[in-house]
Amino acid sequence: MAMRSHYCGLVTEALLGQTVTLSGWVNRRRDHGGVIFIDLRDREGYVQVVCDPDRPEMFKVAEDVRNEFCVQVKGLVRARPEGTTNDSLKSGKIEVLCQELNVLNPSVTPPFQMDDDNLSETTRLTHRVMDLRRPYMQRNMMLRYKTAIQVRNFLDKEGFIDIETPMLGKSTPEGARDYLVPSRVHDGQFFALPQSPQLYKQMLMVAGYDRYYQITKCFRDEDLRADRQPEFTQIDCETSFLNEEEIRAIFQRMIKEVFQQQLGVDLGEFPTMTYQEAAHRFGSDKPDLRVKLEFTELTDVMKDVDFKVFSGAANMKGGRVVALRVPGGAREEGGLSRGEIDGYTEFVKIYGAKGLAYIKVNDKAKGRDGLQSPIVKNIHDAALAEVLQRTGAQDGDLLFFGADKEKIVNDAIGALRLKVGHSEFGKKNGLFENRWAPLWVVDFPMFEHDEEEDRWVAVHHPFTSPKDGHENLMDTDPGKCIAKAYDMVLNGWELGGGSVRIHRADVQAKVFAALNIGPEDQRAKFGYLLDALQYGAPPHGGLAFGLDRLITLMTGAESIRDVIAFPKTQRAQDLLTQAPSPVDEKQLRELHIRLRNPLPAAH
């Protein structure tokens, strides 16, 4: 007989009276007064199998099966008795009366129960094969697969061609650290794994392929965070002969269709916000618009106050002073406690802030006397009045302040805004709106100044085109040069980012010069690109989405590792296979590599 006629989770009342053959895993076995019930599981879900003692041979097998045994069942689909249906299962109205039961493979005792939700990540990643059997992980992986298929179908209909680009490429030490692969054939030389297929896809545009995509792995050897992996999957796209707005329109439609089809969610309109506005209002280039808190600009107000923390920042070059108004944060009942405020003070220090000044607005009508804070005595009346007026503060509100270099203020108070908005207090007091909040952030600066190295670096990458009319600013005032760059942001996560690229060799050389990459270096690192741009390169641009991030958002998973089959830990290790691991001396010799501090040989 066939090993399987149907998936367990797809057996419904449509099959009543039919004999089915199922193969799967024993999720649970229950002995109810002489009748044995087996919950049989496969990737599509569960079905209840009933084993009656009137078939003694089959019943003996049923008595011996345990959780996670791999078994095959042949039986009759019948309606469950009244009062025993389970509406949470597709198969909840039926059960399978077992006629034959074969153990395909027994299982040792599993390291954890499949329904245990309190497992440590170390346990889950060490026993990843078993973790992947759990319905939670199977749902995540199925959604990932369905989303990837839908993206491919969408791009295919839009005329995009799937072209693979090399995994072994040239190392260019711009941006994040490369993963290097030593060449055995070319002594002392190295390939790099791609951080993105950026230059290959641009050259495909020069080659006339017009619309390209691939769903591909990218690699970055950087310190990991909750939403980062050393290898990640990108939906990588490039187009020719489309302007910035046209490119954004295609991919906005793609993401909207994915959410509609996979989740039944209408993402609605995507507002567009400039980088400048996002940083000014929210201190972030990927603002979470679900949080209803905004910065109030106070730099000009604080220039002449006696409180040196504020006046010092207000008068320093590149300094900034802002307030963050927390409605209801100073109320006697239900406001933020002293402990919570102290916790937030420690929290902002992570981002370089030296502390967190605040004012409690107890009674606005009393002016200075209605405000509670050690800093009030050092701020003159006109400044206090302006603070209250600009923030729109009401009785019971709490005002937090940030004063430092602009980057520190934006990072620290921007993070505080999210922390307060997502807190229990924020959710109870209407400071957080539970919805999908997409937007485009556009008009990024072309360059930012690296203080440590005292040089300009590219905000996106050095192949991004400046806005029309901004080319000369690269020579005269790089800080004012705006790029044709855009990011799609959803709920405070950057889902995808892209730009219109430089398609003229002279402009590309100018950007390299602004980044302090001299002519010789340009030829050595990017000569092939500069050459390609001279052969009538078309205007082109594109975008790349992080598939892992997209699925994390769609599933509501707590970690990006919950949507990747075999992820790395935050220390870039694979706990299942124990990678990375030492290699033997012979392999190193073939690669012309000697370790400076060799590991002791394992015994």
UniProtKB/Swiss-Prot annotation:
One Pfam family it belongs to: tRNA-synt_2
Record region (Aspartate): 198-201
Sites annotated Important for tRNA non-discrimination: H32, G83
Primary location: cytoplasm
Binding site for ATP: R220, D221, E222, Q229, E494, G546, L547, D548, R549
Entry's localization field: Cytoplasm
GO CC, alphabetical: cytoplasm
EC number: 6.1.1.23
Residue positions binding L-aspartate: E174, R220, H460, R501
Coiled-coil ranges (or none): none
Alphabetized SUPFAM superfamilies for the sequence: Class II aaRS and biotin synthetases, GAD domain-like, Nucleic acid-binding proteins
CDD domains per record: AspRS_core (cd00777), EcAspRS_like_N (cd04317)
Keyword Ligase: yes
The keyword Nucleotide-binding appears for this protein: yes
Its job: Aspartyl-tRNA synthetase with relaxed tRNA specificity since it is able to aspartylate not only its cognate tRNA(Asp) but also tRNA(Asn). Reaction proceeds in two steps: L-aspartate is first activated by ATP to form Asp-AMP and then transferred to the acceptor end of tRNA(Asp/Asn).
NCBIfam families: aspS_bact, PRK00476.1
Protein name (record): Aspartate--tRNA(Asp/Asn) ligase
